[in-house]
From Swiss-Prot:
Name assigned to this protein: Achacin
Keywords tagged on the record: Antibiotic, Antimicrobial, Cleavage on pair of basic residues, Glycoprotein, Signal
GO term, biological process aspect, one: defense response to bacterium
Signal peptide from the UniProt entry: 1-22
Organism taxonomic ancestry: Eukaryota, Metazoa, Spiralia, Lophotrochozoa, Mollusca
GO terms for MF: oxidoreductase activity
Length: 531
């Protein structure tokens, strides 16, 4: 594997300096006439695309924002069910940090949006239980009690902070909070940088197999432990900066990209938003403009299909605010270069899913269950459960019955692919099948200590699987061997002789890839340099 280390990065920059030769020659296209021309075309109406359009709104330029589907928001996706109309069901991003996510907070104020506490945070003491190897444990028991893992004497003595203990043994780091610059400089005993090791390699150096399994049970999902993931990714998640004040938006997380798009459109009649367009190819004309070839699409019940109708648009500059999983399919020659492809290869997309179910009552908090909890984290395929409160309109209660990732998402997606739908299921891509419902309630009955027959049937349900085009995952993680801070500079401008820029969360920072803030940070990085 070609590692993106410091030397290679410097070499890449030398190769790309303006005025020097480049092997990435643009395709020149003649013939087809543009249906219209704009100063800037922004492709993708998720957080990074709508924020880009918002920042350009008063620059005296003609800007058009394009979106593949019929929905603004990307991986922020607030939905509703008829029997709990006042509950925002967050099928994508659902929370943000009050202080750490600074751009998000500023935009909330600028756009006059309101926020509120995200009640459960990441699982609070006294409200959260863990279900591992058939045993239900409180947070306190997981950190200091008898756990169903055969930990060594050393591991047992450091049970409350086993990840920190392992990192100290690996690298000598003994700080309270691990920062990104610190993590990228850490070395292990054989002289390698920590980011060059997979999490399995790192933990196998200092821990027992049972200790590693215990950490998996303590983690949020499976993301940090999939094959090939960088050890830095894991230790930053577990030991990086954490904030207790966690918020969500009163009108749902989709309200932010929608408000950004609305403000953009209202600022000038020359701006436009065009939904249901897939960018097929990008090339340069003889007069120096960029020709964007779009295919018209149609969206029905969450499924988007392509037509054979083209829409040709010319632009002076292009901002590609689309996920890498869609970007790699774009016909644009600079994306085929070895350096850019190696940068693309630096991250893995994580398939994720959420399944919401509603019930007449919040049975998971009732006296009928042995292990009541507002949040459950488990090694079972449902991964995580969150209480989602009760409707003030109907009194019906909602839960995230499953918040899963990786193989657990694929397992559930297969169950949800065919068969009868539950009563009250959302249609199309957001359906919930009887098979999926039965599997999840069977798992939850074990975690809560209640007979499956004593759990009432759900009144409605909706699901979202982030696993197919254009989103092959809800977030990305860094692979071992790649320096995250160098890689992002290559992705944001794949060709230094072109005014084509890439924004989005997939390659930003070393740990923020799962947050909307990272999408905003990528926009700030690009605009500071090029706009």
């Amino acid at each position: 594997m070609l590692l993106l280390n410091s030397a290679l990065f410097i070499l890449c920059l030398v190769c790309w300096l303006p005025g020097t030769s480049s092997s990435r020659v643009l395709t020149r296209r003649e013939g087809p006439q543009c249906s219209r021309s704009v100063d800037v075309a922004v492709v993708g109406a998720g957080p990074s695309g709508t924020y880009s359009a918002y920042k350009l709104r008063n620059k005296g330029q003609t800007v058009e924002l394009f979106e593949y589907s019929n929905r603004i928001g990307g991986r922020l996706f607030t939905t509703h069910l008829p029997n709990v109309p006042d509950l925002n069901l967050e099928s994508g991003g659902m929370r943000y940090f009050k202080n750490h996510h600074k751009i998000f907070g500023v935009l909330v104020k600028e756009l006059n949006l309101s926020n509120k506490e995200f009640t459960e945070g990441f699982g609070k003491p006294g409200r959260t239980r863990f279900f591992a190897r058939g045993k239900s444990l409180t947070l306190e028991e997981m950190t200091s009690g008898d756990v169903p893992y055969n930990l060594s004497t050393e591991e047992k003595a450091n049970q409350a902070n086993l990840a920190g203990y392992y990192l100290k043994k690996l690298t000598g780091f003994d700080g309270e909070v691990l920062t990104i610059p610190q993590a990228n400089k850490l070395e292990v005993d054989d002289g390698r940088k920590l980011y060059q090791l997979t999490v399995d390699e790192a933990l196998d150096k200092v821990g027992t197999p049972e200790g590693k399994e215990f950490l998996k049970a303590f983690s949020t999902g499976n993301t940090e432990f999939i094959e090939g993931v960088s050890a830095v990714n894991y230790f930053l998640v577990e030991l990086g900066e954490r904030e207790e004040e966690i918020l969500t938006l009163t009108d749902g997380m989709s309200a932010l990209p929608q408000a950004l798009a609305d403000a953009f459109l209202k600022s000038s009649t020359s701006h436009a938003l065009t939904l249901n367009r897939k960018l097929q190819s990008l090339s340069k004309t003889d007069n120096g403009l960029y020709l964007l070839e779009f295919l018209e699409t149609n969206t029905h019940e969450g499924y988007t299909e392509e037509s054979n109708i083209t829409d040709l648009v010319c632009a002076r500059k292009v901002i590609l605010a689309i996920p890498q999983s869609a970007l790699i399919h774009l016909d644009w020659k600079p994306l085929r270069s070895e350096t850019v492809n190696e940068a693309f290869n630096a991250v893995k997309f994580i398939p994720t899913s959420k399944v919401f179910l509603t019930f007449p009552t919040a049975w998971w908090l009732s006296d009928a269950v042995k292990n009541p909890a507002f949040v459950v984290k488990s090694t079972s395929p449902f991964n995580q459960m969150y209480d989602w409160k009760s409707s003030n309109v109907t009194g019906d209660a909602a839960m995230i019955a499953s918040y899963a990732d990786t193989s657990d998402t694929k397992f559930q997606e297969n169950l949800n692919s065919k068969g009868e739908l539950i009563p009250g299921s959302a249609p199309g891509a957001n359906r919930v099948t009887v098979a999926l419902k039965e599997e999840l309630l069977s798992q939850l009955s074990q975690a809560y200590g209640i007979e499956r027959s004593d759990i009432p049937e759900p009144k409605s349900g909706t699901s979202q699987f982030w696993s197919s085009y254009p989103f092959e995952g809800d977030w990305t993680v860094w692979k071992a061997g790649y320096h995250c801070e160098y890689t992002q500079y290559i992705i944001e401008r794949p060709s230094l002789i072109d005014d084509v820029f890439v924004v989005g969360s997939d390659h930003v920072n070393c740990i923020e890839n799962a947050w909307t803030e990272s999408a905003f940070l990528s926009v700030e990085n690009v605009f500071e340099k090029y706009f």
